[in-house]
Amino acid sequence: MKILLFGEFSGLHNNLKDGLIKLGHEVVIASGKDGFKDIGNDINLDPIFSGFIGKIESRLKPFYKLPKLIGFDVVQIINPFYPNSKFFPKEFFYFLLRTLNKKFFILGAGSDAFFWKYGKKTMRYSPFKEWLKYDIKKDSYYMQSKKSFNYNNRILKTSNGVIPVMYEYESCYQSSSKCLNTIPLPVNLESIEYRKNIIRNKIVIFHGLNRYGFKGTK
């Protein structure tokens, strides 16, 4: 199959691509480089310019690259709110991706309106309060709005399904008939050199540097 993976969060689609290629599929990633992580892709959606010109470019580039994003058997988007650019016509763009390709799936990953609405109800522990307090320093977030939820729901209903990457997202989408089986986060073990743990007098825990409120590090 010819597969398009649209968007990227922390190498998720890159690891998935490795596995799909090994299974014999043709895979293309169209995304930005996820900020400081500088993650690779096949079609780069990051702007070349900075400032105001860069903001305009970031909103036009997905449409400019559209001829390279059509004719796929399967399209999977990393999140219905990707790219997270104000005034980018996401709903129209995803309509084009659905229309010009065969199947269209959403990944249940990152933050979306379903996660914000149902996460507080279904999970005993959640990062929402800390995200508001420490990361954006506001009392509310736009994904809590009815407008965001209705948009999220429209994208869901017109898709072939949502694929959660862990139980938290499954619990938030489980009321929808579009919720498919959870497929855990992919990891390419062949790219990781195994080194035996050396146990000394203390335990060292690695916790990646990212978003203090949401993930607990800064």
Describe each PLM feature range.
Residues M1-D38, D42, T99:
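N-terminal subdomain of nucleotide-sugar transferases
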Residues K2-G7, K65-P89, K103-L107:
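Short N-terminal targeting/anchoring amphipathic segment
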Residues G11-N15, Y212-K218:
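A conserved mid-protein helix/loop that constitutes part of the nucleotide-sugar donor-binding site
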Residues I48-L66:
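Glycine-rich, highly charged phosphate/nucleotide-binding loops
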Residues Y64, F92-T99, R124, F128-G161:
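Membrane-proximal helix-turn-helix segments that form the acceptor-binding/catalytic region
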Residues V74-Q76, F95-D135, L180-T182:
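Active-site proximal beta-strand in glycosyltransferases
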Residues F115-W116, S140-T182, L189:
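A short, active-site helix/loop in glycosyltransferases that binds the activated sugar's phosphate group
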Residues N181-K215:
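Conserved donor-binding/catalytic core segment of Leloir-type glycosyltransferases
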